[in-house]
Amino acid sequence: MNIFEELKARGLVFQTTDEEALVKALTEGQVSYYTGYDPTADSLHLGHLVAILTSRRLQLAGHKPYALVGGATGLIGDPSFKDAERILQTKETVLDWSQKIKEQLSCFLDFDNGENKAELVNNYDWFSQISFIDFLRDVGKHFTINYMMSKDSVKKRIETGISYTEFAYQVMQGYDFYELNAKHNVTLQIGGSDQWGNMTAGTELLRKKADKTGHVMTVPLITDATGKKFGKSEGNAIWLDAKKTSPYEMYQFWLNVMDDDAVRFLKIFTFLSLDEIAAIEEQFNAARHERLAQKTLAREVVTLVHGEAAYQQALNITEQLFAGAIKNLSAAELKQGLSNVPNYQVQAEDSLNIVDMLVTAGISPSKRQAREDLQNGAIYLNGERLQDLDYSLSTADRIDNQLTVIRRGKKKYAVLTY
């Protein structure tokens, strides 16, 4: 099975410009290819991982990746399928975000070894050197307005209004391909399926300006079995930066993937072989309640993104919280595992009597209910049942002198911080 066949088998090929020519190029020698990442935030997220890992698979097959950080295009904003114009960021912000994205990409691509080691480029380096007049004369003249307006990515915005700034975005992305081809002999661009219009602008410019053929391959935009956009949890993006999304949160995200998605995601997001995935699928289908596919997915992706130690910590937090063994975890681990739990900052004037604190922290709606909860054995302090109505919290109840965990029943938590 050649690399293109494997990508197809993993569900990673959505559309190509000329499949036969692309397969021929990939099987006959080393291909230099690139994927672009606009710095629209200070971190990449799970949605970016599809293209990043596809790029890594091609590198492992002997091809040479170029990771393009859009320091210039990030200043403009891609209008593709957006309902409204993006808020323009300052140059300083985009520069800072560009640097952070560079650092993240180095975790996935090999920038150090072999003749096909990855290269990092920033399109600000060339766009900052081109005058507006030269850009219009040398690049703009190759694009007709009819061609630019025909792109599905901007048709919707034409109806509601689009600035010239965003309208010109596809020409800038097209020039990226031309520049990388001229300087590095890059002949293939990889990106999300929503980028098709911008990406083919590059092959158009290559054909008209240099009389060369470029290839485009898009990866699918991933949705779950219900059709919901992938990569978000409770409406929040799952970031690759551990400071924005903890390894535990990422672990839980994968652990809660639906059965109908789990095996498909193993093919897309892990480097397990297709034979290994087939064996997992067989075991998974025989006992879905054991969630083997989800557990494997969580292990593989968290280890890939954050490392083995972070995976082991996420697994330990999961197991200890499930067992109610709060005292087996550090304050730092509890902050990860209980990040979505209501947090109450204890004030100097607060009563530390347990009945009062249950009401103050929002665990029980009233003192009467708090007393009943205690008497019925429904209250747990740092994982241990508490029934003493006269109990007062002390420094001994603070884990690492930072926090106390109170639970009512099985699921209602509050974290007290000091």
Swiss-Prot record:
Residues noted as binding ATP in the record, renumbered to the chain: 232
This protein's GO CC annotations: cytosol
Binding site for L-tyrosine: 34, 169, 173
One GO MF term: tyrosine-tRNA ligase activity
Subcellular localization(s) per the UniProt record: Cytoplasm
EC number: 6.1.1.1
Pfam short name (any one): SYY_C-terminal
InterPro entries: aa-tRNA-synth_I_CS (IPR001412), aa-tRNA-synth_Ic (IPR002305), Rossmann-like_a/b/a_fold (IPR014729), S4_RNA-bd_sf (IPR036986), SYY-like_C (IPR054608), Tyr-tRNA-ligase (IPR002307), Tyr-tRNA-ligase_bac-type (IPR024088), Tyr-tRNA-ligase_bac_1 (IPR024107)
Catalyzed chemical reaction(s): tRNA(Tyr) + L-tyrosine + ATP = L-tyrosyl-tRNA(Tyr) + AMP + diphosphate + H(+)
PROSITE patterns reported in the protein's UniProt record: AA_TRNA_LIGASE_I, S4
Statement: the UniProt record of this protein carries the keyword Nucleotide-binding: yes
Motif ('HIGH' region): 39-48
Keyword terms, alphabetized: Aminoacyl-tRNA synthetase, ATP-binding, Cytoplasm, Ligase, Nucleotide-binding, Protein biosynthesis, RNA-binding
Record motif 'KMSKS' region, residues: 229-233
Record-annotated S4 RNA-binding domain positions: 352-418
Main location: cytoplasm
One Gene Ontology biological process: tyrosyl-tRNA aminoacylation
Subunit description: Homodimer.
Protein family (similarity comment): Belongs to the class-I aminoacyl-tRNA synthetase family. TyrS type 1 subfamily.
Cited function: Catalyzes the attachment of tyrosine to tRNA(Tyr) in a two-step reaction: tyrosine is first activated by ATP to form Tyr-AMP and then transferred to the acceptor end of tRNA(Tyr).
Protein name: Tyrosine--tRNA ligase
Organism, scientific name: Streptococcus equi subsp. equi (strain 4047)
Lineage: Bacteria, Bacillati, Bacillota, Bacilli, Lactobacillales
